[in-house]
């Protein structure tokens, strides 16, 4: 299977590292993947139709922070050009989320790849949060797989759990602690750290961005919640329609007050069915100490799916590192390597011009 990677940040390099060391993992024995192209936004691109030497790619990146024009596989290609020009079986979308652009250009990358007959694995949650129904329909029409396990909770099999483990059950409600940065900062505030110190430490340790506003203002959790609601609840819930409260400007007295009431203050995302639609919100909530949500510390996360038939299902993730996130992509590649492509969905012709009508049966 030939893979084209769009983006080579922490997750992309984690994927490459796992592929380089795949012989160390018995469960990856069946994974036959050649990365034939890597495209970055500002650090160049590499293309080799026989497969790139990923060990050398990682070493060069570590030394140079990009792809030098002198590299024998260097190519002057952007993402869309690569999708159109580089023969591959799967496009792996690893570019950063652009919330202000409502998921673009990742949405266009995914759509173009599907239209050209490629399978798609995306770690970017934007295409799910803003365009999932259209992209899923495009994949079905083309008979291609669209996989996205890494978009929420890193490598935890959230979507595979719902797809294979909750067959026949309807998700009525979603609740989750979905943003690692804000949860770690809240834990630090509980210990008496100043907000600015807690944020600076999160940035030093690499789980907060240089511009942390999307995390602190609840946008990251809102985008993840919208992605979950679209996929698991069939909801037309865009991130902008999720009511939002972040932790910027949080009065530390709220944390102490929650503790005095036998609770912890957590930033929780919720989506629920109401009046034929799905509503969502992200906000600070006091959770009782006997609630599993109260046990979620530092960069860990948790998701609760409330269903009609399977009851309440809870999954947690404890302090993931970048290889856990990369594993979600590897898991999707394993799915592609073992699953036959779905049959293209035929569009039914509409009644009217060009549509064949049936003759009414003669009454007997």
Regions found by a protein language model. Give the residues of each.
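N-terminal glycine-/serine-/threonine-rich beta1-alpha1-beta2 phosphate-ribose binding loop
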Residues: 1-115
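General beta-strand structural signal in soluble alpha/beta enzymes
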Residues: 90-93, 121-123, 146-150, 173-176, ...
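Rossmann-like NAD(P)H-binding beta-loop-alpha module
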Residues: 140-208, 219-220
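Catalytic, metal-anchored helix/loop core of enzyme active sites in primary metabolism
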Residues: 173-175, 183, 189, 201, ...
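Substrate-binding/catalytic subdomain of NAD(P)-dependent oxidoreductase enzymes
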Residues: 188, 199-295, 300-302
């Amino acid at each position: 299977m030939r893979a084209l990677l769009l983006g080579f940040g922490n997750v992309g390099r984690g994927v490459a590292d796992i592929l380089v060391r795949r012989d160390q993992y018995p469960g990856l024995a069946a994974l036959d993947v050649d990365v034939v192209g890597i495209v970055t936004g500002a650090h160049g691109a590499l293309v080799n139709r026989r497969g790139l030497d990923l060990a050398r790619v990682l070493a060069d990146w570590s030394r140079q922070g990009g792809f030098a024009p002198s590299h024998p596989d260097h190519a002057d290609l952007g993402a869309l050009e690569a999708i159109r020009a580089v023969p591959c079986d799967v496009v792996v979308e690893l570019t950063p989320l652009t919330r202000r652009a409502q998921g673009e250009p990742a949405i266009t990358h995914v759509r173009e790849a599907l239209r050209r007959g490629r399978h798609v694995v995306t770690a970017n949650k934007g295409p799910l949060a803003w365009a999932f129904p259209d992209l899923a329909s495009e994949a079905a029409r083309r008979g291609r797989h669209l996989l996205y396990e890494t978009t929420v909770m890193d490598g935890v099999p959230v979507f595979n759990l719902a797809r294979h483990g909750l067959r026949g059950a309807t998700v009525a409600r979603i609740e989750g602690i979905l943003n690692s940065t804000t949860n770690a900062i809240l834990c630090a505030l509980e210990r008496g750290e100043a907000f600015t110190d807690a944020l600076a430490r999160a940035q030093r340790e690499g789980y907060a961005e240089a511009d942390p506003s999307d995390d602190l203002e609840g946008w990251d959790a809102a985008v993840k919640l919208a992605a979950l609601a679209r996929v698991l609840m069939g909801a037309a819930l865009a991130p902008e329609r999720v009511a939002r409260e972040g932790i910027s400007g949080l009065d530390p007295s709220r944390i102490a007050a929650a503790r005095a009431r036998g609770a912890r203050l957590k930033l929780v995302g919720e989506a629920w069915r109401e009046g034929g639609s799905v509503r969502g919100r992200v906000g600070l909530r006091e959770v009782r100490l006997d609630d599993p949500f109260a046990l979620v510390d530092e960069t860990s996360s948790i998701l609760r799916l409330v269903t009609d038939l399977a009851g309440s299902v809870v999954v947690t993730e404890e302090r993931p590192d970048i290889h856990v996130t990369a594993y979600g992509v590897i898991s999707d590649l394993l799915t592609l390597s073992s699953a036959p492509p779905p049959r293209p969905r035929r569009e039914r012709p509409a009644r009217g011009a060009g549509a064949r009508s049936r003759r009414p049966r003669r009454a007997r």
